[in-house]
């Protein structure tokens, strides 16, 4: 009786470990794909000659209401389509010129610093989880340099795409793919 019980216990434990390992692999693969998709979203801005020209003209003439409306509309569509909770457009000095958001909190010093770093590096960066110093909320951020011309060149500014992990990421992590 004891040997039979121990054998069943070992088999059950092995089966549970196998299922947990499969779930972990599935979650890691899905999270990796999600991150790649977010970085692909940033390609809408990165080395996009049309966007670079529009941003450059806006930085040169920020009082042009028509240009501001076009740019704000364009960024708003990106925000809505890809479910970012905030998009910020920075000029080459790191000053925020346009914020498309559902929130009004000020930009954190870490955000301003990261925008400058991305412009200096000339390549996009996926920033880790950050707690907002003003609201205490946690966000992920993607920073994208706006380069002068499609093949690179001088940085004209940067775009920050802010992700609220409560929208997709946290619910996904908590979801269990098999009956428990």
Q: Where are the regions that the model predicts?
A:
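PAS/PAS-like sensory domains
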Residues: 120-128
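Amphipathic coiled-coil signal-relay and dimerization helices
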Residues: 45, 53-55, 94-102
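Juxtamembrane extracytoplasmic/periplasmic/luminal helical "stalk" adjacent to the first N-terminal
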Residues: 1-63, 76, 80-85, 138-140
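A short beta-strand signature within small-molecule sensing/ligand-binding domains used
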Residues: 135-146
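Short N-terminal helix-loop-first-beta-strand/juxtamembrane motif that initiates sensory/input modules
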Residues: 37-45, 76-96, 123-124, 174-180
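Solvent-exposed, extracytoplasmic
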Residues: 66-83, 102-114, 131, 147-180
């Amino acid at each position: 009786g004891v040997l039979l019980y121990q054998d069943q216990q070992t088999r059950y434990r092995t089966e549970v470990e196998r299922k947990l390992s499969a779930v972990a692999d599935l979650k890691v693969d899905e999270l990796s794909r999600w991150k790649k998709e977010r970085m692909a979203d940033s390609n809408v801005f990165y080395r996009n000659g049309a966007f670079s020209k529009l941003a450059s003209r806006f930085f040169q003439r920020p009082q042009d209401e028509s240009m501001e409306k076009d740019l704000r509309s364009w960024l708003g569509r990106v925000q809505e389509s890809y479910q970012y909770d905030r998009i910020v457009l920075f000029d080459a000095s790191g000053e925020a010129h346009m914020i498309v958001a559902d929130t009004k909190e000020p930009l954190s010093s870490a955000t301003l610093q990261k925008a400058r770093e991305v412009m200096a590096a000339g390549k996009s960066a996926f920033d880790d989880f950050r707690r907002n110093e003003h609201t205490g909320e946690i966000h992920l951020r993607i920073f994208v340099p706006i380069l002068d011309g499609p093949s690179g060149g001088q940085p004209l500014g940067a775009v920050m795409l802010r992700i609220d992990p409560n929208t997709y990421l946290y619910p996904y992590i908590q979801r269990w793919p098999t009956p428990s």
